[in-house]
Amino acid sequence: MAQINVIGQNGGRTIELPLPEVNSGVLHEVVTWQLASRRRGTASTRTRAQVSKTGRKMYGQKGTGNARHGDRSVPTFVGGGVAFGPKPRSYDYTLPRQVRQLGLAMAIASRQEGGKLVAVDGFDIADAKTKNFISWAKQNGLDGTEKVLLVTDDENTRRAARNVSWVSVLPVAGVNVYDILRHDRLVIDAAALEIVEEEAGEEQQ
């Protein structure tokens, strides 16, 4: 069980969560799946049938002393078609839900092990003002020297933080392995953290 300190408006508390041991292979598998799913897959080349060339034979088969050729659309000529080039396709594939949930729990565990996890019992951000968020961040050791991923469904907090250059904001439903790993710190609602870990635990059973 991992001991996680939770900060809040009415003081702090400690929660215990069954964080798994970090496995870089699982994290790599989940990140690869995420990035593959994001690929647009629009790369496309023209085949020899699609390039704008005449189909006429370049010159006679015999008598010129040159190599034998047909038309100019073949891949050996500049401006010819591309052999076996890319065509629009989907790079998406299915990764088991159990692996995805385990990867998410491991990503959170990696931030906890490095002391880069901040769990919060309700954000005290008044009026959705950016200056109020920055003041709150400084009080809790966030001074802008690190990239921060903020995960919360609190609308005031999300609006207050979205203009801060070193903060990325995600709703609880959007938390994912790739974004956790590419940020230095994870700031997350304690309730959301417990839900994520509970789901991961159910998948492992």
From Swiss-Prot:
Keywords: Ribonucleoprotein, Ribosomal protein, RNA-binding, rRNA-binding. GO terms for cellular component: ribonucleoprotein complex; ribosome. Gene3D superfamilies: 3.40.1370.10. The keyword RNA-binding applies. It holds the Pfam family Ribosomal_L4. InterPro entries: Ribosomal_uL4, Ribosomal_uL4-like, Ribosomal_uL4_dom_sf. It comes from the Bacteria. Disulfide bonds: none annotated. Coiled coil: none annotated. GO terms for biological process: translation. One of its GO terms (molecular function) is rRNA binding. Belongs to the universal ribosomal protein uL4 family. One of the primary rRNA binding proteins, this protein initially binds near the 5'-end of the 23S rRNA. It is important during the early stages of 50S assembly. Part of the 50S ribosomal subunit. Contacts proteins L15 and L34. NCBIfam families: rplD_bact. HAMAP family: Ribosomal_uL4_B. This is Large ribosomal subunit protein uL4.
